[in-house]
């Protein structure tokens, strides 16, 4: 079910869920801009604007209700997402002058795990005919009907004992969900290559008249630009197994060319400032550091980003 915490009834219901015995796991996916500390958020806000402040309220209500700690799975594409989220919560504990017992509860009874999701999910289905056909086929109305690629991997950083707590192994998803002690190699590969490719070419492609990712893969200039960026400017900066990187990059074109996924460029462009900083800037800076010159494609990508946000672009 979905709750709207910006409505009084929805906020109250959210707090009831926070204190429920059934609640064991919270998953967050609030984009690169989501895990941010906002000092303007107050304990009395219903709800506060930032996600970490909302989470602090939820955990505090759960603590005051005498319920056990939860497992927090952060999916945002930032470094150390679980740890950064915990840092924000601890800052709100200090700002709101909450008791030491709650701070101990958050840091010892709750488990903040970093994680990495690798699956292209372009958004809800908009075609009325397709929606009607799916509803007829399955026999029910789904107001949150979405579409995603078949490929999917979720890497969770944590102790092996998480496999006994989380339901994925029992659900037969051992080939798609991995619990590992260090997810940084998986994250760097995915963020720099797959996400970096998306953010690296979509703004320029949109300015050139394209609307969906698949169309770009059918354009020799666009696809050539993406491949040159990946193989000449991104992969050489990654201190990981080169065969693995080349194999992963090779699959990117096929995934972007999925005939069943209409991934809109404007959807990917959301929060491009934080995305370019997280996905492309590290490759840009490391290339300059190693080669002593500007990377041609990444520099053009940066120029397209500036042009995209220019007042001259409609």
Summary of predicted features, one role per range:
Residues 1-314:
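Substrate/ligand-engaging "lid" and interaction regions
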